[in-house]
Amino acid sequence: MTELTLRPWQAQAIQKAERWFLELGNKHFLVNAAPGAGKTICASVMAKRLIDKGEIERVIVIAPRREVVRQWGKDFSDVTGRHMTKVTGADGDVSDFGDDLCATWAAIQALSEPFQYICQNFRTLVICDEHHHAAIEAAWGEGAGGAFANAVFSIILTGTPIRSDGKETVWFAYDSDGKIDHPEEGTFTLSYGEAVDRGYCRPITFHRHEGHFTVTLPDGEGIAVSSQQKGQIDQRYNDIPGLQRALDFYKLACAPQYKPDGATPDPASFLGTMLDWGISKLDDIRDTTPTAGGLVIAPSIQIAEHMAELLEEMTGERPAIVHNQTPNAESRIASFRNNDTKKWLVSVAMISEGVDIPRLRILVYLPYAKTELAFRQCMGRVVRSLGADDFSRAYVVMPSLEVLEEHARRVEEEMSPQAREEPQHTFKVCPICEAQNPRGARECSECGHEFPEKATRYKTCPDCEMLNPITAAECQHCGAKFAADFEITLRDALRMGAIVRGMDLDEEDVADSEEMAEDFREFILASGDDFLVKIMRDVPLEAISKITKFAEARRRKSEE
């Protein structure tokens, strides 16, 4: 059991929760704290206090995905000295698996009966991590309502207390702004801006990556598209299927482009120039934080694979890549977390929430859905501070899309003016002995380590033709905004539409599909039904959650 020194906010939250539970006689306490502020430790200490006072006998933790469940087991054991058993829906009756259990939200429906038995027969605390997963229209949200109805207490944790879809969740309603509606006395809130000012989170800078696309039609005519300009289609092209859908700035921004050989990813494409900015910024950060890494969030497995190939083409190093078809994905995440020399990790939705990789500093953000909930979750992967000596900053590279810019502006407004200013470091840190050296030093003054030569990368302003650093958002000489021009064929534009298949998925659909993909695949293959196997090949795995929700809705309707 680890002896802990609590952060002031954690001590305040614990004191407030104890009063809410024990003096005022309430059941549900909400902790709304910025990603990386320390919610897991806070809730574990709350649980230990209640155990020590004899108020509870057992603890059940529900977390968003398996990797987060694993982290919960470790942190809970470190704080309480009690073992927490990780259980899945395949385990059946888990009521005698141990005093303290941890499962994913997706497992609740299969485990609702044993969880209900535990809550009815033992004084049980339920800790709900990332509470937005508990939408009552989702199967596990409905299961949670019944399974945990008799829990003595529940602690609800969230770093993003917003649901853009307005769905009601277990225990809490949402107000007209999509925010959790719960009494102030039963809530502890620590905003991202407050967490930055207190040193719990890093300040963040957003790079809006603009681009102008020209979609070339078969007759040679071009249609201009940008984030500020929708593609205008002449009537004579109305018979081209899917053309209007293809002329979407975000779809074009995500479209893979290749060199003339048709196989090599093109570094001069929109995706390539986004990565170029991230690569250059990560190289700068590694001068002062030699272990820093970058994360790419892609909208689909196909694009994640393309981004990985682009990174390898541009850096000479194959990045780590994880998605629901990756063998031993959790082991790969753990390997990246512990391998300080590996610079980049590419994922679809497996790193979007709860996964703690403290060395991440750069996020290249190309999500499938563009909700504020998903935005703040992914942002949370790069803002976790390492403590008082962590002077680094977090960066997000994203397409210049209005909805993403609105999310970014709200985050920036939470930060103090001082936190928004980007400091200029005059030193670099030796990766061997960690000594600080002048930025221009060729070798470490302490251990003699030779710093590798780093070529400064520039781009030319199209207006004044002067050179600027590759990461500059505007010309340092004439002030012109940088927005590269990209040509893309109609075939490639339509191909992107085929990749995403025009399906209306949100980030939670994608995340839930990631969680259930393995079980779904095993079920289909075990059925021996060739037709179902063919459907599984044709339907994107990101859509599994949508399909199961449809089936559940049909079942309910037939029972009415």
Where do the protein language model's features map onto the residues?
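Conserved helicase motor "Helicase C" RecA-like lobe of SF1/SF2 P-loop NTPases
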Residues: P299-H323
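Interdomain helical connector at the RecA1-RecA2 junction of SF1/SF2 helicase-like NTPases
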Residues: G166-T291
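Conserved RecA-like P-loop NTPase helicase motor core
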Residues: R318-P423
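Conserved pre-motif I regulatory segment
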Residues: M1-N32
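Walker A/P-loop
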Residues: L24-M46
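Conserved Walker A/P-loop ATP-binding site and its immediately adjacent core
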Residues: T40-C42, E55-D78, P299-Q302
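Inter-Walker segment of RecA-like/P-loop motor cores
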Residues: V79-E113
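SF2 helicase catalytic motif II
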Residues: Y117-I156, T160-I162
